[in-house]
């Protein structure tokens, strides 16, 4: 039996972030909708061709999205919140953008949909909204249109569709509460209609993604799979697709389903392939996700060959990426500045396609020449194990010497809070921001000129100093209580720190999509991590010299740096996090010596790092909390430690949030209408909290009354004396006009509430 290969999805944004640029041009009114649609067509055609040329047998169609693939599925099903609907009930691309951003070139602005993390990745999806009795219909034919495009170009394709149960699982009920699973029978007819349309086009296989099957689902959700897939069978062959973890705990449900194939992630998952092979129906195709879609490391193809060869001819087999290549940069060949040895350790999306092709060829026709090719390809990643670039004896010794005293503050929170109140004398409802201010074209140009050698260090520092001075002056004028320096010197909250730590390397074009048009360029952790010199002290000290008000020192926490980087795979995540924590612990100490009394250690990714299965949570939370405390505990009692978290469901990890022992935690809550505070109320969270009062991901400016109402809602759950007032997140992606207006309204809302207390 010939083995075929396929990818589960491909990066959408383009090698030069063409999609991002086209989206933002269209949103700004600088280009037409047709010009935007043309960019999408060109990117899809290029990406299909690139995969085919790299040796991929079946290219995915339906993985492209204008904003997010879950949002695309919502539109496919006609699930558009009433506030975003067109007057005539039609659905167009601006409908999609209004749901994602809150506004579009046409239609009335309205609050954007909630956004949260896609499983345990750094990609974000738009949360589907459900209401009792809502109707579903095929409302958006993007998938079918793109299938027609790909077929017209002569590609062998495999359409990709987010499965119905995972779709419902990912959504939220709005308004009157009910069981969203009860909507299953309402959405299945749309899925049937889509599959029928695909069958008409001669499609043989459809990849139907059900990553919820790696979770510990409630029994009623597991029970729903059988009738759902009974309703979907018969029109095309269904490849039930899972990723991000193992499926062994749900195998009884899976193997009883009326599907024709199963894809499993054997990179992240730990399913025994021999047992899995034995337990599945003999006629099923088994697709093995052997090439890591979430990291940048070259695969050891010789090892994979040895592991997979016993399965050849046991059943129909495909080889695939572990998950969509969405999470990987596109092309390593674009990286012209990487050291040759380090570059030889990496593979980006196109190289991963070539890896699939090479491994498939070797398994289909194993001969000495092919095995030698596998060995030659795998040699660099094997040689890395003994590279001096990877190991630092001093770091390893310091890590081994950590004691329990190193991770505890000197005094408990209540005693620290008293010393901090005396030091800072802040008003009730203290106002602050999360850290960054708008990254203007001028700021980005300044950094780029410095990076490319067109600007010397002295003039660069002068330019950055001017932007910091401007940010401090703006905050003083607005009347904020605790200021920030604005982070003009930082391109990205993780990349900036990685650039100043040993053990990291950086790419030129290693962009991956975070959400919508937002792309990030994660650093790669290649070895042991240390801090050669202070990173943030110069700018924090300068900013503090400009004002009598406290200025926060701003650090990205160890768990977030780990989660938002491509990590090394030869040591545990715990080891990496604690190495980063030790490096940043020294930074906390240096900031204190420079007179900085409030230090924020951002951990927006803390929850995102959770394993997908609860059985594995406790071990992760223990070392994640310890890493944060190792970073922070060197601070003196009158130094106020803040932390910030994003997109979190906190109720199931409140013990660990409290265990961080941060003096103040700021969280994103505005999109969820403060419902996240219920977790803190139920837990009786003891420290101070800054619930975000407006959504910085939307350009809409909140009114004073809106902010005041949210703060009143917050005060019903948290004592007012422990509440701070702040936006949801950093302001780097916003413009100055809306930033000024929103912050002015926020400060005024806080002042009104203070006046009531007098």
Curated annotation (Swiss-Prot):
- The EC code for this enzyme is 2.1.1.14
Instruction: List residues binding 5-methyltetrahydropteroyltri-L-glutamate.
Output: 17-20, 117, 518-519, 564, 608
NCBIfam families linked to this entry: met_syn_B12ind (TIGR01371), PRK05222.1 (NF003556)
Its function, per the record, reads:
Catalyzes the transfer of a methyl group from 5-methyltetrahydrofolate to homocysteine resulting in methionine formation.
InterPro entries listed in its UniProt record: Cbl-indep_Met_Synth_N, Cobalamin-indep_Met_synthase, Met_Synth_C/arc, UROD/MetE-like_sf
Give me the residues that bind Zn(2+), please.
644, 646, 668, 729
Please tell me the species this chain comes from. Answer: Yersinia pestis
Instruction: Give the gene that encodes this protein.
Output: metE
Could you identify this protein by its name? 5-methyltetrahydropteroyltriglutamate--homocysteine methyltransferase
Q: Keywords for this entry?
A: Amino-acid biosynthesis, Metal-binding, Methionine biosynthesis, Methyltransferase, Repeat, Transferase, Zinc
Active-site positions on this chain: 697 (proton donor)
Cofactor annotation: Zn(2+)
Q: Zinc as a keyword?
A: yes
Molecular function terms from GO: 5-methyltetrahydropteroyltriglutamate-homocysteine S-methyltransferase activity; zinc ion binding
Pfam (any one): Meth_synt_1
Q: Tell me which residues bind L-methionine.
A: 434-436, 487, 602
Q: Under which main EC class is this enzyme filed?
A: transferase
